[in-house]
């Protein structure tokens, strides 16, 4: 039995509120259970120096957590004077995951920065950031298309992510914090709407796992990502 009472293949309730902020070209507040992340997308008519003049666009991301997103206060990284290793790892993951669904030629020589700010954390913040970040990106690109700034849609496939793991010996979908902290195996699965893999992060936390168990987690992830993509499409319809 899961602490939440959910079935093994049951996701937490998902809601996506678009247009949550008025200034960003795209914004979405995604809630997956008690994990809440605000995602905004900003369009800039510039690109990093390493692709300047190439005609290619760029999508990048930044990630952070509010001090009381967790049960005890965390010091702001800006106060500490540097980003932690976890933050850097996660924002790089978000950026490369989102880029996997983008035609950078069609985007043109501009950059879109997706900011993901965790308001409340209860497990799966990086997955929620990727899923909500795609919605913010979709909304920002819609504005480019409406203005005629791009000829064709540069977003070729939705991108979403979900955590799956082995808890109490059972494969489970969408781990919350109590499950994540006790999981024997923990994994993050990033996929496209067409069920193509972008990245899989899996590690044995308390016990090793078999190929069969990995396949079970992959099946759960595919189901979960399908549900998340449906929520993305409903939010941006």
Curated annotation (Swiss-Prot):
InterPro entries: ExoRNase_PH_dom1 (IPR001247), ExoRNase_PH_dom2 (IPR015847), ExoRNase_PH_dom2_sf (IPR036345), PNPase/RNase_PH_dom_sf (IPR027408), Ribosomal_Su5_D2-typ_SF (IPR020568), RNase_PH (IPR050080), RNase_PH_bac-type (IPR002381), RNase_PH_CS (IPR018336). Coiled coil: none annotated. Phosphate binds at residues 86, 124-126. Its EC number is 2.7.7.56. Keywords: Nucleotidyltransferase, RNA-binding, rRNA processing, Transferase, tRNA processing, tRNA-binding. GO terms for biological process: rRNA catabolic process; rRNA processing; tRNA processing. Transmembrane segments: none annotated. It holds the Pfam family RNase_PH_C. GO terms for molecular function: 3'-5'-RNA exonuclease activity; tRNA binding; tRNA nucleotidyltransferase activity. The keyword Nucleotidyltransferase applies. It is an enzyme of class 2 (transferase). It catalyses: tRNA(n+1) + phosphate = tRNA(n) + a ribonucleoside 5'-diphosphate. Belongs to the RNase PH family. Phosphorolytic 3'-5' exoribonuclease that plays an important role in tRNA 3'-end maturation. Removes nucleotide residues following the 3'-CCA terminus of tRNAs; can also add nucleotides to the ends of RNA molecules by using nucleoside diphosphates as substrates, but this may not be physiologically important. Probably plays a role in initiation of 16S rRNA degradation (leading to ribosome degradation) during starvation. Homohexameric ring arranged as a trimer of dimers. HAMAP family: RNase_PH (MF_00564). This is Ribonuclease PH.
């Amino acid at each position: 039995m899961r602490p939440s009472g959910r079935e093994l293949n049951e996701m937490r309730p998902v809601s996506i509120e678009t247009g949550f902020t008025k200034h960003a070209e795209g914004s979405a507040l995604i809630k997956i259970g008690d994990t809440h992340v605000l995602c905004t997308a900003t369009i800039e008519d510039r690109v990093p120096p390493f692709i300047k003049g190439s005609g290619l666009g760029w999508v990048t991301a930044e990630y952070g957590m509010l001090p009381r997103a967790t049960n005890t206060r965390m010091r702001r990284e800006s106060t500490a004077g540097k980003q932690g290793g976890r933050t850097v790892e996660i924002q790089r993951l978000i950026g490369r995951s989102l880029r996997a669904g983008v035609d950078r030629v069609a985007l043109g020589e501009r950059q879109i920065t997706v900011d993901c700010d965790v308001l409340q954390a209860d497990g799966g913040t990086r997955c929620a950031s990727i899923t909500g970040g795609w919605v913010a990106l979709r909304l920002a690109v819609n504005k480019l298309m409406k203005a005629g700034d791009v000829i064709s849609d540069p977003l070729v496939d939705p991108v979403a992510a979900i955590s799956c793991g082995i808890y109490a010996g059972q494969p489970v979908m969408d781990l919350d914090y109590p499950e994540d902290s006790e999981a024997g195996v923990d994994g993050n699965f990033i996929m496209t709407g067409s069920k193509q893999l972008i990245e899989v992060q899996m590690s044995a936390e308390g016990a090793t796992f078999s190929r069969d168990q990995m396949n079970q987690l992959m099946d759960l992830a595919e189901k979960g990502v399908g549900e998340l993509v449906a929520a993305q499409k409903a939010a941006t319809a």
